[in-house]
Amino acid sequence: MEKNIIEMFSLDGMNAVVTGGAGVLGMSICRGLAQAGARVGILDIKNFDEAAAQLVSEGLKAEGFYIDVLKKEAISECAKKVMEQFKRVDILVNCAGGNLKEATTSPQLSFFDLPLEGLEKVVALNLFGGAILPSQVFGKEMVKNPEGGSIINISSMNAFRPLTRIPGYSAAKAAVSNFTQWLAVHFAMEYNKLLRVNAIAPGFFLTQQNRYLLIDENNNLTPRGQTIIQHTPAGRFGHPDDLIGTCIWLASKSSRFVTGVVVPVDGGFNAFSGV
């Protein structure tokens, strides 16, 4: 056992990459990993250089890289550049994802009229781009690490409790949770027993993708937002920083015997029966 419990949570000397790293949740995760000692690659389709510059200005180790998680060729090119600079990747956080209005039911758009294109985009972004493709490309390098590593997918509370209005997103995130368990077993049994794969299932966090569902134009809770708060024992939406502790735990040696799990970070939403 390590001499100091703090050392078990330290990421000193480790290299981490985060897809969707310039987004609201991704940037918070990048900052947390860097504060724990990791050198962080911020991978995104835009704003990656600005995000990296912000962390560097805070005295942290970060670099930005372009990635399009929907294109395997672009992911491979990104991984090539990352490996040239980092030499090794110890931690992969698959944080890219989101929902789209055209895959969301509403009074104007019923389930029967949801366009296939919108549903396909949401599934592609959250399942293929949000988990499978980056894990294929970066995982191929990570299985070579003698000390293993950690892949962390971002699932959702929707994977446990499918929510109204967002069928594509709920289905995709349920698939991410299932894929997480599958990949954990596959990597451990076929390639490297020290390479772990887990997922975090956030509850309700305000992001650009879901804000229109939860907050109205007057910055008040929508009926849907009110219902969520009433069913969240913590009594609030999640803050991006609320994901950091769980992410560092899963990335560090402190969770070295943990693989194939999906950890809720939801303020108690999943545990509350409503009465």
Question: What annotation goes with each model-predicted range?
Answer:
Residues 2-7, 247-248, 259-275:
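Short C-terminal tail/terminal secondary-structure segment
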Residues 103-123, 228:
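Substrate-binding pocket helix/loop in short-chain dehydrogenase/reductase
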Residues 156:
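Residue(s) in the substrate-gating loop at a strand-loop-helix junction
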Residues 80, 121-145, 184-185, 189, ...:
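Amphipathic alpha-helical dimer-interface segment in Rossmann-like NAD(P)H-dependent oxidoreductases
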Residues 135, 172, 180:
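Active-site helix of classical SDR
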Residues 126, 130-133, 199, 220-254, ...:
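C-terminal helical subdomain
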Residues 191-196, 258-260:
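Short, small/polar-rich loop/turn modules that mediate ligand/substrate recognition or access, typified
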Residues 8-41:
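Canonical Rossmann dinucleotide-binding motif of NAD(H)/NADP(H)-dependent dehydrogenases/reductases
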